[in-house]
Regions:
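Acidic, divalent-metal-binding catalytic cores of TOPRIM
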Residues: 2-332
Length: 332
């Protein structure tokens, strides 16, 4: 059974653990807790946050890995701090792994990024980008009650989604270019966590992505992030935008992609519900919400429901097979 921490003790390693604990005064609490609970029999995965637990639980299960302890570190920086605490002459890199988001590390220096044979990075910005993929779109339709559509209808919905997602990514390059410039220039406070896609983008009744003008987007992004608009350099932002264009499918911030995905899925469900095309059978996860006419998907559904539906990532399966699976085979 997969679990998030446990309370098992292994007396055979406690003496060694006590020595390690006594020598580490500034280690993250997560790491010291790990040492106190460590056993040689278990495998461990350090992740950034609670949302990662839901996603990686499902991915591990799809890899036929039935037992691994997932440890939440509360942020990428703390995952790295935990990694740096380990003496790898004492622990196996096949037993202990670290799962982090790639973020923008392919484009700019990320002080919290790190690499090793036991470090897995998402192939896109974050796990949200993976969940909001065309591969998971059909699963989402099922969760919304689209049971009886023909293959041709499903393919049409997927095609329409990809067209709108492409429009979204093209436009969001402006926002990402601004963020990249802020990061590379160390502009503060640059609170881009405050940027809400809904402030400048919405899904129309006929399920199309609609944006405000570039100038309006720029003003809203700078205001929300508490950055002086005088810092805006049109030429440099344009250059960055051109440089990152080919990577647009992988670098749009995950939280922004979530916003598009939820709104778009809600829009098509409402539209088809009004045409009586949804089969709201009892086992439809969200059927009761649909019937009440409320928003069909919320952020909690995004992780709780859609994470579990996401297909297995081949790159993740390969990572698991060459790390924790190897450790378990050797131990058995």
């Amino acid at each position: 059974m997969l679990e998030v921490w446990g309370s098992l003790k292994n007396l055979d390693v406690m003496n060694e653990v006590e020595k390690l604990l006594s020598s580490i005064d500034t280690a993250p609490v997560v790491y010291t807790n790990f040492l106190e609970n460590y056993t040689k029999e278990d495998c461990y995965a350090f992740v950034e946050g609670d949302d990662d637990v839901l996603f990686y639980n499902s991915q591990f299960q799809k890899c036929n890995l039935t037992k691994i302890k997932i440890i939440v570190c509360e942020g990428k920086q703390k995952v790295k701090q935990c990694y740096e605490c380990f003496n790898w002459s004492r622990f196996s890199k096949k037993q202990i792994v670290f799962l982090i988001d790639k973020d923008l590390s392919d484009i700019i220096d990320d002080p919290n990024d790190f690499s090793d044979e036991n470090v897995y990075k998402t192939p896109m910005y974050a796990i949200e980008n993976i969940i909001a993929s065309s591969e998971n779109f059909e699963n989402t339709l099922s969760a919304l009650g689209f049971y009886n559509l023909r293959d041709q209808q499903i393919e049409r919905l997927r095609h329409d989604f990809l067209v709108e997602k492409e429009t979204f990514e093209e436009k969001m390059l402006l926002v990402m270019a601004i963020i990249i410039r802020w990061k590379s220039m160390h502009i503060k406070p640059a609170n881009y966590n405050n940027v809400k896609v809904k402030d400048f983008c919405h899904i129309s009744d006929d399920c199309h992505v609609v944006f405000l003008s570039d100038q309006e987007i720029i003003e809203k992004v700078y205001k929300a992030s508490q950055v002086d608009l005088g810092e805006y350099d049109a030429e440099k932002i344009s250059n960055i935008r051109n440089e990152i264009h080919e990577k647009r499918h992988k670098i749009i911030r995950g939280k922004y992609v979530v916003s598009l995905y939820l709104d778009y899925c809600n829009a098509i469900a409402k539209r088809h519900h009004s045409k009586h095309l949804l089969d709201l059978r009892n086992d439809s996860i969200l059927s009761s919400i649909v019937c009440k006419g409320k928003n069909l998907l919320q952020v909690c559904d995004y992780y709780r429901v859609l994470s579990a539906m996401c297909p297995l990532l081949p790159c993740f399966c390969e990572f698991v097979n060459r790390t924790v699976m190897q450790y378990k085979k050797k131990a058995s």
